[in-house]
């Protein structure tokens, strides 16, 4: 018997690492379904958000069994830079994939001041996690990736394979150039 019908996990997952995976594994133990709210889901790539939402879905699912994959749902959250509008968007997207009268919770970890958004959903029961995998941050992982290194100690196998394949693309080369030039603008075209 599960404590929740749905647990919502909000993140950019750029890329999906072991602390993310550990959070989902905990969520799957406590909930029938896990809803991953993929942040920064607009169709633009830049060095902070190199992967499109559909690519992140593939990267994430590749790390789970078929039975687990059936229990993971995705919603795509576009950046709006207004907390009230953003919360409304997240709630609307989540309500679009849950059954009526479901018990919904929010799972996460208050790692730093950027985690304040976890307090914006008082109607969802909070499942607060202690520090996971030494509170690893994806920023230095992305930076190493742009230098050509995949830090395998921080990633599950499916992510490693995804990153390895993505390195072979023209998009990766463009992102790598942007990183070297410290250019945070969006790539012009979607590939």
Residue ranges, per PLM feature:
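Nucleotidyltransferase catalytic core that binds NTPs
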Residues: 1-191
């Amino acid at each position: 018997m599960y404590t929740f019908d749905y647990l919502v996990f909000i993140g950019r997952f750029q890329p999906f690492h072991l602390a993310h995976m550990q959070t989902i594994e905990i969520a799957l133990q406590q909930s029938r379904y896990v809803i991953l709210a993929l942040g920064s889901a607009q169709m633009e790539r830049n060095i902070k958000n190199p992967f499109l939402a559909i690519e992140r879905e593939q990267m994430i699912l590749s790390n789970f069994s078929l039975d687990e994959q059936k229990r993971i749902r995705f919603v795509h959250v576009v950046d709006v830079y207004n907390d009230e509008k953003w919360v409304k968007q997240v709630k609307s997207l989540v309500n679009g994939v849950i059954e009526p009268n479901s018990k919904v919770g929010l799972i996460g970890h208050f790692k730093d001041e950027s985690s304040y958004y976890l307090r914006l959903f008082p109607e969802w029961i909070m499942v607060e996690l202690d520090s996971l995998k030494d509170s690893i941050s994806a920023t230095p992982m992305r930076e190493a990736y742009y230098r050509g290194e995949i830090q395998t100690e921080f990633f599950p196998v499916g992510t490693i394979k995804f990153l390895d394949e993505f390195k072979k693309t023209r998009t990766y080369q463009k992102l790598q150039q942007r990183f070297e030039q410290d250019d945070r603008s969006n790539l012009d075209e979607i590939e």
